[in-house]
From Swiss-Prot:
This is Probable outer membrane protein PmpA. One of its GO terms (molecular function) is ubiquitin binding. GO terms for cellular component: cell outer membrane; extracellular region. It is a peripheral membrane protein.
């Protein structure tokens, strides 16, 4: 027979004071010590062997005496602490004696902390000990499950707040925060120790996981210390896992190795987490500003990953790992402003594999003189795999420190491969790219080829026909003057299988040898492809004797015109050219630029070889005609006459001959701009309806004696549908109205609305956001069955537009729109029943006038739009009803109508647009809006004495298409 010990302890200072000297012993083979502070509220059920021990605890305990503070357990089958409410353990210090386990010390079996309700939480605060595990120490495993909060703050130890010799796991907790903890050893918060591999796991957390400002500092009494500012694992094969969690943040942690996480001989893995993953401002005295591990993986994340401003005094500003693997992540990944004093500004690794399923950017990372502004690959047989699958990869603004005898200076560098690489593979899916705006350096000789878009990557979901780009486009003027900032070097063979290898904007690519079996190689003015020679950066090497083979050559087009030649230099190797030339301008930038495309333009590629330039299988007869938008014309190709008979040097020329015609790109027409006036129209219409709704014909529906105030929220949407286009507009905000009864039959109202909005036209890359303010006033007069009402509204709308384009940059525009709307109407009651219900007919006239200011966009090739206006005069007619059910204190009231509206005068918005770069103008119109509509409105009011709650809904259908809906609700009080 097995029975379970269950200890219910609620920490209460009054209970403790009543029996401070009480002594109690529990004779149980596994329970070695129960703290005395539990005795005031203790229920004990004596167990026998082979059963888990359960202890239900809660309350707040501050301790000075270890005997009354530390809970010790030793049940081999495990000890479960049941947490029913908040448990706080704080202000305990034991620094003059070496002893592990500040709050909990577990000598055998697994120790678990199990939350049993929504308020279950544990707080460890200011617990300082000279030993391991200021919060919990276990000779076996530790588990935290189903807690609302788990907090550790301001504690100190010689190894972790939570320390175990086996596993430490966190499951199904809601909020975890570890801040300002210090370890004079390893693991500022969590430490795995012992002589067997263990794991730290965070699984299925329902809230944020936060490690902030934790430290692991060195200790003179410990041989290896200062590892893992937040988490440390020592034994080979140990695993640190974050699986299926929400937000994860490591910020401001520090250590000697691994500013946030240290697991030198094990695995650090982030798998399938739904929230953002961020490592920010973590630092280390040695390697791994954020992470130091043998194997790092971040896979299947569905939110952004960020490594920002981490720093290492040696290598790996963000990550120091032998193996780095990033793949199947669905959101953006950014490594930005990480630094390493020696090498690897963001990453130092031996084998690095990165696959982009969304954008991956390495920007503004910096390394010391070992190089690798973004990535440093070192060790035996380093390998690099970069794959742009369904997102692009870009390196920009990364630098390394270049030291000479005279000075040291920053030099741009994205990747440096220190030893002879075993494998370098670059592959981009069709319509995707890998951009190196900073050079790549692989100086150690190797016969293993660099493979670009190799056929082995071909799958039904991946076509290796994308672009690998080496570019100097993002360099500032001072940096461009140093040719080293634009020169990538591979002391290995380079093999282009498919897609495009583009060398542009003055970039240079120097390779051991080059072979092309498919795809295109593109060179823009001032760029070059060269085999290294004695005069190249490879000192002591000689030029390759293998032929430089090109079977698909393209002229790359830069945005700015240039007279510089592109070059292909084969050195001592033969240069063999076959196929036919083409133009590489995937985004059509050349044809949009009047400075280049409106006039004749030439580009040249110089081909040189000390052996022979063989063009016997190359033809220049084909023309390339612009079939895109922009300036029209054709490219003609020819050999410069004075080099035709020169076998070692030839110049290939591409000549652009324009026709003078310009074709506007369809998605640049700008239809969303005049269409945005309908957003202001919707703003005015909604504000006018909200005001008129509370000027009911039956005065009893608004319980106002002299003065009333109404406050509520309102929202509206408007859409148009036709065979050609669809547009969508939405507004959301708040409204307030004051109502004054001037006489028993005359009511004055006034107020305002503040509404935000969004609008766009389907299939156009333009999105407009708006913020508008409306001021309005209304007047209603009742003469028996006849009611006359009028409203006047004035609006100011601030608009901002972003155009998401695939070209060099997005464009942005800002402008104001002004609007006025006035209504005048009358209604007549023709049926009334016992002061509870009436039916009336109505007829109104509504006039709206809206003016948009002229504006010019900013960004690449901006558009200018002239001022435009929208004028609309409509006459709605129909019948309506009102009812009132209740008494003088409590009542349910309602109002509704059905009607028909006809626009008797309409001036649709139309604007003149202009492209300054192209000197081209055109007229653009907003989307078509029908001039007749059917309307349906309903309002319900719940009144109690002078207070009311209301909800109002409007629907307008124009010619069979749902055009607009609005909904408002709020409260009213009268005095």
């Amino acid at each position: 027979m097995n029975r379970v010990i269950e200890i219910h302890a609620h920490y209460d200072q009054r209970q403790l004071s009543q029996s401070p000297n009480t002594n109690f012993l529990v004779h149980h083979p596994y329970l070695t010590l129960i703290p005395k502070f539990l005795l005031g509220a203790l229920i004990v059920y004596a167990p026998y062997s082979f059963a888990e021990m359960e202890l239900a605890i809660s309350g707040h305990k501050q301790g000075k005496d270890r005997d009354t503070f530390t809970m010790i357990s030793s049940c081999p089958e495990g000890t479960n602490y049941i947490i029913n409410r908040k448990l706080i353990l704080s202000d305990f210090s034991l620094l003059n004696k070496v002893s592990s386990g500040g709050a909990f010390r577990n000598l055998a079996g697994k120790i678990s902390f199990l939350g049993k309700n929504s308020s279950a939480s544990i707080h460890f605060k200011h617990i300082n000990i000279n030993g391991f595990g200021a919060g919990v120490f276990s000779e076996s495993s530790i588990e935290f499950t189903d807690l609302r909060k788990l907090v550790a703050f301001g504690s100190e130890s010689t190894g972790g707040i939570f320390t175990a010799k086996e596993d430490i796991s966190f499951k199904n907790n809601h909020h975890i925060a570890f801040r300002n903890n210090i370890t004079k050893g390893n693991g500022g918060v969590i430490q795995l120790q012992g002589d067997m591999k263990g794991s730290v796991s965070f699984v299925d957390q329902r809230g944020a996981i936060i490690f902030t400002n934790n430290q692991a500092v060195t200790s003179s009494s410990m041989k290896h210390s200062g590892r893992g500012g937040a988490i440390s694992g020592d034994f080979a094969g140990s695993r640190i896992l974050f699986l299926n969690n929400q937000q994860i943040t490591f910020e401001g942690n520090s250590a000697v190795h691994g500013g946030a996480i240290y697991n030198k001989n094990g695995l650090v893995e982030f798998l399938g987490n739904a929230g953002p993953l961020a490592f920010k401002e973590n630092t280390t005295i040695a390697n791994g500003g954020a992470i130091y591990t043998s194997n790092f993986k971040a896979n299947q994340q569905t939110s952004p990953i960020l490594f920002s401003q981490n720093h290492a005094n040696k290598k790996g500003g963000a990550i120091y790992a032998q193996y780095v693997n990033l793949e199947q992540n669905q959101d953006t990944i950014r490594f930005e402003k990480n630094t390493a004093k020696e090498g690897g500004g963001a990453i130092t690794s031996s084998q690095c594999s990165i696959t982009a399923h969304n954008t991956i950017i390495f920007s503004d990372n910096a390394a010391g003189d070992l190089g690798g502004g973004a990535i440093l690959l070192e060790g035996k047989k380093p390998s690099l795999t970069l794959i742009a699958h369904s997102g692009n990869i870009a390196f920009s603004g990364n630098t390394m420190l270049h030291i000479t005898k005279k000075a040291s200076l920053d030099r741009h560098n994205s990747i440096l491969i220190k030893e002879a690489p075993y494998k370098i593979q670059l592959a981009a899916n069709k319509n995707h790219s890998i951009h190196f705006f900073d050079p790549v350096m692989a100086l150690s000789a190797s016969s293993s080829p660099i493979q670009i878009n190799a056929p082995e990557y071909e799958t039904p979901f991946f076509s290796p026909k994308g672009m690998i780009v080496f570019s100097g486009a993002n360099l500032l003027d001072d940096a461009r003057e140093d040719v080293a900032n634009r020169t990538s070097i591979f002391n290995q063979p380079v093999h282009l299988y498919n897609g495009t290898l583009s060398i542009e904007n003055g970039a240079h690519l120097i390779v051991q040898s080059f072979k092309q079996t498919g795809g295109r190689i593109s060179l823009s003015p001032g760029s070059s492809l060269a085999l290294y020679t004695m005069n190249s950066f490879f000192h002591g090497n000689i030029s390759s004797k293998e032929p430089l083979e090109i079977n698909g050559l393209s002229f790359g087009v830069d945005i700015s015109p240039s007279n510089l030649q592109a070059e292909i230099r084969a050195g001592n190797a033969p240069l063999r050219l076959s196929g036919s030339p083409s133009i590489h301008d995937p985004e059509g930038l050349f044809y949009e630029n009047r400075d280049t495309a409106a006039s004749p333009y030439q580009m040249e590629i110089l081909l040189t070889s000390d052996k022979i330039v063989d063009i016997s299988k190359f033809t220049t007869d084909s023309l390339v005609t612009n079939k895109q938008s922009g300036f029209q014309g054709a490219w003609h190709f020819s050999w410069q006459p004075n080099t035709i008979n020169n076998t070692k040097q030839k110049i290939l020329r591409a000549s652009w001959l324009p026709t003078g015609e310009y074709v506007l790109e369809s998605n640049r027409v700008g239809r969303a701009v005049p269409n945005s006036l309908w957003s202001t129209f919707l703003l005015l219409q909604t504000a006018s309806h909200n005001l008129g709704d509370h000027l009911c014909n039956n005065r009893s529906l608004i319980p106002t004696s002299y003065f009333g105030v109404l406050i509520g929220g309102t929202g509206a949407e408007m859409s148009t549908h036709s065979s050609e286009e669809e547009s969508f507009i939405s507004r959301l905000g708040a409204t307030g109205t004051s109502i004054i009864r001037l006489t028993p039959s005359l009511t004055l109202s006034g107020g305002g609305s503040h509404m935000f909005g969004d609008s766009f036209v389907a299939d156009l890359p333009e999105h407009i956001t708006s913020e508008g303010i409306v001021q309005n006033v209304g007047l209603t007069h009742v003469w028996g069955p006849l009611t006359v009402n009028s409203t006047l509204c004035a609006a100011l709308d601030h608009n901002a537009m972003v155009r998401i384009c695939s070209k060099k940059d997005h464009t942005y525009g800002k402008w104001d729109t002004f609007g006025m709307r006035g209504t005048l109407g009358a209604s007549y009651t023709f049926l009334e029943y016992d002061q509870t219900m009436r039916v009336f007919s109505f007829a109104n006239i509504e006039a709206t006038n809206i003016l948009q200011r002229a504006f010019t966009e900013t960004g690449y090739n901006p558009r200018s739009f002239s001022k435009t206006k929208l004028l609309n005069i409509a006459i709605p007619i129909g019948i309506g009803y009102e009812f009132c059910l209740g008494n003088s204190s409590f009542a349910l009231l309602g109002k509704g109508s059905i009607g028909y509206s006809r626009d008797i005068k309409r001036e649709n918005p139309s604007t003149l647009a202009h492209l300054a770069m192209n000197d081209f103008a055109w007229t653009t119109n907003g989307c078509s809006v029908p001039t007749s509509a059917h309307t349906l409105a309903n309002q319900l009011i719940l009144r109690y004495k002078a207070c009311s709650l209301y909800i109002t809904a409007y629907t307008i259908n124009r010619e069979g298409k749902n055009l607009s809906n609005s909904l408002s609700c709020g409260g009213y009080v009268g005095f």
